[in-house]
């Protein structure tokens, strides 16, 4: 062994990671690396880069969970090499998946299934769940039109201000999206404008039970009743899919009297995010159908399971089973009682923030985080005609300097001149943490008041409100 080899071996065995040769170079970013390096050095490089991400706990823009207990991490680790799609190889994980489907269907008042198993599936998130619900709507509509001898080349979907996944669905599956635009004084889909957009080519109506822009609910029951009258007048029968990405795991616990789910006969499917207020880690969504008739069988594929076969309906295939396992853990750990306590705590924080922020400026609130109003979000704008000497963009920028990611953005449709700020309250953002936000909020206002030349210069930032 020559001297260089000895030196290299000593470096490999004895050097600390910060004294290692490989850490003295810039990590490759454009070409596949030629040489290997020590695992601790590779980890250190990546770990250090991740410090440049924002602090997830201070991210008040996201709807997604940013806190998970230690047991969730353990279960995710145990399941990291189990492929969710392989039902035959991992039958117990598949059984847990089916249990979760039954539990969610029960939560949303689905009719009792004939064979004891509810109709639904886990997804990578609510966006995939929406895609699946939309596909089933289109297939059901096409069957009806073909049976009536009518053309099927111009399907349309009616909705209010929706998350971007519905725009993707419409484009990918060649469906005209008739989105009822936001306008001042009418920020959500209302029965009158909905009916004006419907015709015999409407595959379905999609209310958003927790609008991404503001947090308010689009209440399905008035829309449902309007569709009943529309059918009585025209003979046209239109289904509903409820996009309950956020509200699906809130209203059942904190506002059970809101009739939004399968208690409404036109509701054929519901989608929701497990990783939002379902409290699961990222990568978990659910879609449930009313019954077997609501899910066209030509969309279902059968795979081997316990010597027999089980139907699957998904866009994604290989992925870890950990998200489903973690969701089941949360269901077992918390139950209805625990979910009610956790969600109520988020609403209490939202109400406190709304009350305190109202004292700090000329604000008009669109959502105050009440359980009968929407999800635990606080959304507000500057009152018309008021000029406090700063914009909400300025305020958002100042808060970000303290680590808080609080989005300011324009509304959509015909309301693009309205700028709002939205604060999401969720598990892990407790009252004491909210008080720290308020202190930084007040400090930001003082700074903007003390430095008037800086006011109004912040540009619309890149926050994604959805």
UniProtKB/Swiss-Prot annotation:
PROSITE patterns: DDC_GAD_HDC_YDC. Its EC number is 4.1.1.15. Induction: By acidic conditions. Expression is regulated by a complex system involving RpoS, cAMP, CRP, EvgAS, H-NS, GadE, GadW and GadX. The level of involvement for each regulator varies depending upon the growth phase and the medium. InterPro entries: Glutamate_decarboxylase, PyrdxlP-dep_de-COase, PyrdxlP-dep_Trfase, PyrdxlP-dep_Trfase_major, Pyridoxal-P_BS. The modification N6-(pyridoxal phosphate)lysine is found at residue 276. SUPFAM superfamilies: PLP-dependent transferases. One of its GO terms (biological process) is intracellular pH elevation. Its cofactor is pyridoxal 5'-phosphate. Pyridoxal 5'-phosphate binds at residues 126-127, 212, 275. The keyword GTP-binding does not apply. It holds the Pfam family Pyridoxal_deC. Keywords: Acetylation, Cytoplasm, Decarboxylase, Lyase, Membrane, Pyridoxal phosphate. The modification N6-acetyllysine is found at residues 446, 453, 464. One of its GO terms (cellular component) is membrane. It is an enzyme of class 4 (lyase). It catalyses: L-glutamate + H(+) = 4-aminobutanoate + CO2. Substrate binds at residues 62, 83. One of its GO terms (molecular function) is pyridoxal phosphate binding. It is found in: Cytoplasm; Membrane. Converts glutamate to gamma-aminobutyrate (GABA), consuming one intracellular proton in the reaction. The gad system helps to maintain a near-neutral intracellular pH when cells are exposed to extremely acidic conditions. The ability to survive transit through the acidic conditions of the stomach is essential for successful colonization of the mammalian host by commensal and pathogenic bacteria. Belongs to the group II decarboxylase family. PANTHER family: GLUTAMATE DECARBOXYLASE (PTHR43321:SF3). Changing Lys-276 to Ala increases thermal stability and protease resistance. The unfolding temperature is increased by 11 degrees Celsius. Homohexamer composed of three dimers. This is Glutamate decarboxylase beta. It comes from Escherichia coli (strain K12).
């Amino acid at each position: 062994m020559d001297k260089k080899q000895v030196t290299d071996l000593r470096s490999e065995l004895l050097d600390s990671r910060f004294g290692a040769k490989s850490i003295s170079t810039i990590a490759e970013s454009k070409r596949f690396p030629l040489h290997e390096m020590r695992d601790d050095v590779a980890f250190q490089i990546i770990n250090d880069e991740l410090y440049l991400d924002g602090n997830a706990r201070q991210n008040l823009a996201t709807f997604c969970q940013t806190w998970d207990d230690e047991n969730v991490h353990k279960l995710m680790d145990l399941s990291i090499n189990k492929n969710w799609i392989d039902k035959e190889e991992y039958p117990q994980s598949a059984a847990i998946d089916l249990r979760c489907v039954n539990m969610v269907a029960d939560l949303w008042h689905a009719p009792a299934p004939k064979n004891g198993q509810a109709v639904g599936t886990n997804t990578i998130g609510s966006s995939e769940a929406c895609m699946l619900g939309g596909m089933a709507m289109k297939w059901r509509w096409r069957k009806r039109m073909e049976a009536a001898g009518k053309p099927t080349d111009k399907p349309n979907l009616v909705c209010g201000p929706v998350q971007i996944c519905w725009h993707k669905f419409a484009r990918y599956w060649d469906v005209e999206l008739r989105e009822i635009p936001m306008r001042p004084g009418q920020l959500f889909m209302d029965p009158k404008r909905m009916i004006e957009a419907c015709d015999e080519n409407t595959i379905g109506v999609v209310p958003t039970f927790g609008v991404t822009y503001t947090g308010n609910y689009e209440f399905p029951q008035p829309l449902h009743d309007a569709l009943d009258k529309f059918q009585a007048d025209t003979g046209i029968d239109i289904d509903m899919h409820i996009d309950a990405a956020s509200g699906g795991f809130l209203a059942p616990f904190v506002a059970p009297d809101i009739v939004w789910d399968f208690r409404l006969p036109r509701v054929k499917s519901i989608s929701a995010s497990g990783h939002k207020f379902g409290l699961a880690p990222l990568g978990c969504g659910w879609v449930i159908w009313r019954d077997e008739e609501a899910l066209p069988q030509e969309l279902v594929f059968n795979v081997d399971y316990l010597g027999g076969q089980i139907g699957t309906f998904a866009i994604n295939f290989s992925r870890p089973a950990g998200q489903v396992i973690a969701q089941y853990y949360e269901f077992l750990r918390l139950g209805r009682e625990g979910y009610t306590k956790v969600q109520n705590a988020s609403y209490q924080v939202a109400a406190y923030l709304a009350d305190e922020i109202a004292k700090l400026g000329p604000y008009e609130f669109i959502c105050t985080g009440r359980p009968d109003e929407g999800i635990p979000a606080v959304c507000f704008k500057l009152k018309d005609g008021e000029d406090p000497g700063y914009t909400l963009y300025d305020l958002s920028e100042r808060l970000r300097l303290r680590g808080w990611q609080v989005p300011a953005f324009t509304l959509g449709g015909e309301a693009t001149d309205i700028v709002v700020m939205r604060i999401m309250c969720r598990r892990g953002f407790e009252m004491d943490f909210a008080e720290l936000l308020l202190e930084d909020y007040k400090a930001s206002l003082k700074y903007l008041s003390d430095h008037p030349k800086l006011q109004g210069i912040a540009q619309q930032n890149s926050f994604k409100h959805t």
